From Swiss-Prot:
Essential cofactor(s): Fe(2+)
Domain of life: Bacteria
Main location class: cytoplasm
Similarity annotation: Belongs to the KAE1 / TsaD family.
Chain residues that bind Fe cation: 111, 115, 301
Listed GO MF terms: iron ion binding; N(6)-L-threonylcarbamoyladenine synthase activity
Record's protein name: tRNA N6-adenosine threonylcarbamoyltransferase
Gene3D superfamilies: 3.30.420.40
Organism: Cupriavidus necator (strain ATCC 17699 / DSM 428 / KCTC 22496 / NCIMB 10442 / H16 / Stanier 337)
Assigned keywords, A-Z: Acyltransferase, Cytoplasm, Iron, Metal-binding, Transferase, tRNA processing
Cofactor: how bound: Binds 1 Fe(2+) ion per subunit.
Record HAMAP family: TsaD
Function summary: Required for the formation of a threonylcarbamoyl group on adenosine at position 37 (t(6)A37) in tRNAs that read codons beginning with adenine. Is involved in the transfer of the threonylcarbamoyl moiety of threonylcarbamoyl-AMP (TC-AMP) to the N6 group of A37, together with TsaE and TsaB. TsaD likely plays a direct catalytic role in this reaction.
Catalyzed chemical reaction(s): L-threonylcarbamoyladenylate + adenosine(37) in tRNA = N(6)-L-threonylcarbamoyladenosine(37) in tRNA + AMP + H(+)
């Protein structure tokens, strides 16, 4: 079964072709970072318009790269939500039109499920069950994953997500957009321990997160340093990253202990952070925990994860395949709502 995946939930247009027999055949991505940089964040209307311009050329690109035609497509998976409504509608509209024209079934994919399953695209995918640390954009969650469509929320952020804290800290430090990679790069030059920042909810006794207080602590420090030199900024960035990593790593290990699982999967944009990977690898080795990550190319939003997640859902529940071409979008969508009947 050849599945076309379409991702357009925010500021990346991603398309991919995944074959359930041969694996990932082709994927293409256009990032809008340069377009939004002048605004310091994503402008929804501009994002939607750019998706319109990019999606069909990217479709032709992945077909050419895979040596396939539109008529070879057996099913279409698209990001139904969550995300920016206008951006999601672009992908949904193209998916509906293609599905109708080709008379192939469609399946709407939860964006976070795409991230959750992206490490399964690696050469050595993790077997079920496992604990997943999902740190993508506006989401920070710990999930117990027992199979496709069988997910249990263990803990989540009560306010800012880790990615949002990175972006806001970048602005406080006068860094560019996107903030996460900029903060991480600057932190490489920082001196450990130069600033003392809190580790919110580190000892809360549950698996929830909170990063709003950490952001406020960074703001307080920047105000104290009216004439911040480059080394001070690097030191503060290092203190911030260390605090985030400490909390994410500790909560992940607590989730593994609570569930009894020995495998941890890390997914989402923050999952590309080098310091976080090194800490989790170190702690995993000490505790005999296997830690898995997606390829760096698939940490950010992409079409490959949507094609793969759609293919896995169609294999697990063929009844999801719909020849109805009026699919809408779900900008706000709880991951618990996509539980498959077989997982009940």
């Amino acid at each position: 079964m050849l599945v076309l995946g379409i991702e357009s939930s925010c500021d990346e247009t991603g398309l991919a072709l995944y074959d359930t027999g041969a694996g990932l055949l082709a994927h293409a991505l256009h990032s809008q970072i340069a377009m939004h940089r002048d605004y310091g964040g994503v402008v929804p209307e501009l994002a939607s318009r750019d998706h319109i311009r990019r999606v069909l050329p990217l479709l032709e690109q992945v077909l050419a790269d895979a040596g396939r035609t539109r008529q070879d497509i057996d099913a279409i998976a698209f990001t139904q939500g969550p995300g920016l409504a206008g951006a999601l509608l672009v992908g949904a509209s193209v998916a509906n039109a293609l599905g109708f024209a080709l008379n192939v079934p469609m399946v709407g994919v939860h964006h976070l499920e795409g991230h959750l399953l992206s490490p399964l695209l690696t050469r050595e995918p993790p077997p079920f069950p496992f604990v997943a640390l999902l740190v993508s954009g506006g989401h920070t969650q710990l999930m117990e994953v027992r199979g496709i469509g069988d997910y249990t929320l263990l803990g989540e952020t009560l306010d800012d997500a880790a990615g949002e804290a990175f972006d806001k800290t970048a602005k406080l430090l006068g860094l560019g957009y996107p903030g996460g990679p900029e903060v991480s790069r600057l932190a490489e030059f920082g001196i450990p321990g130069a600033f003392a920042l809190p580790r919110p909810m580190l000892h809360s006794g549950n698996l929830d997160f909170s990063f709003a207080g950490l952001k406020t602590a960074v703001l307080t420090q920047t105000r104290k340093l009216a004439n911040t030199c480059e080394q001070d900024r690097a030191n503060l960035a290092r203190a911030f990253v260390d605090a985030i990593v400490d909390v994410l790593a500790a909560k992940s290990m607590a989730a593994l202990k609570q569930t009894g699982h020995k495998r941890l999967v890390v997914a989402g944009g923050v999952g590309a952070n080098r310091q976080l990977r090194e800490r989790l690898d170190q702690m995993g080795k000490q505790r005999k925990i296997d830690v898995y990550y997606p390829d760096l190319a698939f940490c950010t939003d992409n079409g490959a994860m949507i094609a793969f997640a759609g293919a896995m859902r169609l294999q697990a529940a063929p009844e999801l395949a719909r020849h109805e071409y009026g699919y809408g979008v779900t900008p706000r969508w709880d991951l618990a709502d996509i539980r498959l009947p077989s997982a009940a």
